[in-house]
Curated annotation (Swiss-Prot):
It comes from Shigella dysenteriae serotype 1 (strain Sd197). The chain crosses the membrane at residues 14-34, 51-71, 86-106, 121-141. It is a multi-pass membrane protein. This is UPF0756 membrane protein YeaL. It comes from the Bacteria. Pfam families: DUF441 (PF04284).
């Protein structure tokens, strides 16, 4: 039996490799392994909890410099005195607000999910983007304050 979904996943993984975006390629290959093994029984759990777990891991990565002491408290305090840091804070708030609206939209209008997923994968693969909110916020900040 021909599995169109598997073919699509393989194509997207290939696109990830061709564009040198291992994040996309490895993620899709993991999903392919789950799909073709008995691990496929975990798909409902992955679909329900995957985004939350990803956000937790991302947040750990973002907060690690504070927890490790690499980013000292004095730097955090001074961030409220620098206009670029204030722009970063404002953009972060706006992006998280938009993210909340996006989660609600994806939950209520499932017909948009496929387009969002394809657009995300293509954007990540073709433009070497990263599918995460905080890094998008940083990208927006770089547009406002200039890339330095």
């Amino acid at each position: 039996m021909f599995d169109v979904t598997l073919l699509i996943l393989l194509g997207l993984a290939a696109l990830g490799f061709i564009s040198h975006n291992t994040t996309v390629a490895v993620s899709i290959l993991v999903l392919i392994i789950v799909r073709v093994t008995p691990l496929s029984t975990f798909f409902p759990w992955i679909e329900k909890q995957g985004l939350s777990i990803g956000i937790i891991i991302l947040t750990i990565g973002v907060m690690a410099p504070i927890a490790s002491g690499t980013l000292p408290p004095s730097t955090l305090i001074h961030s409220f005195l620098n206009w670029k840091s204030l722009v970063a804070i404002a953009v972060g708030v706006i992006v998280y607000w938009l993210g909340g609206r996006g989660v609600t939209l994806m939950g209520s209008q499932l017909q948009l999910v496929a387009g969002l997923l394809v657009g995300t994968v293509l954007g990540v693969a073709l433009f070497r983007g990263v599918p995460v909110g905080p890094l998008i916020a940083a990208g927006l900040v770089s547009l406002i304050v200039g890339k330095q």
